[in-house]
Amino acid sequence: MHLSQLLACALLLALLSLRPSEAKPGAPPKVPRTPSGEEVAEPQAAGGGQKKGDKTPGGGGANLKDDRSRLLRDLRVDTKSRAAWTRLLHEHPNARKYKGGNKKGLSKGCFGLKLDRIGSMSGLGC
């Protein structure tokens, strides 16, 4: 029985490792720039160059804009999840305020609430 469970787990792990992972796109390729900051056109492969007047299929500029917005959206989600993990791991930012023994002058009731003068005198706070 244990051997079949072990074999099933190994098979599942093998299938998961073969499945292509959904990786985030890497950094966009850097475009060489001139010292004045203008982009330099990269030379095309032999015979595959396009003329200045030719339009790229799919709208060229729209694809670049979509890629940038998708990258920004992915970064924003990552920031939110990172903040959630930080809050989870660090119990409270002002934890020192709540730690420590009882301070002088604070009377605590039965449930940890501060009692007023009448409740502390008469015992009606509980």
Curated annotation (Swiss-Prot):
One GO molecular-function entry: hormone activity
PROSITE patterns: NATRIURETIC_PEPTIDE (PS00263)
GO cellular component, one term: protein-containing complex
Primary location: secreted
Family matches, as InterPro entries: C_natriurtcpep (IPR002406), Natr_peptide (IPR000663), Natr_peptide_CS (IPR030480)
Keywords assigned by UniProt, alphabetized: Cleavage on pair of basic residues, Disulfide bond, Hormone, Osteogenesis, Secreted, Signal, Vasoactive
Skewed-composition ranges (Gly residues): 46-62
Location in or out of the cell: Secreted
GO BP: angiogenesis; blood vessel diameter maintenance; blood vessel remodeling; c-di-GMP signaling; cellular response to glycoprotein; cGMP biosynthetic process; chromosome organization; cumulus cell differentiation
Domain of life, per lineage: Eukaryota
Annotated Pfam families: ANP
Propeptide: 24-73
Cystine crosslinks: 110-126
Region (Disordered): 20-71
Secretion signal, residue range per the UniProt entry: 1-23
PANTHER family xref list: C-TYPE NATRIURETIC PEPTIDE
Assigned protein family: Belongs to the natriuretic peptide family.
Name of the molecule in the record: C-type natriuretic peptide
Name of the gene this protein is made from: NPPC
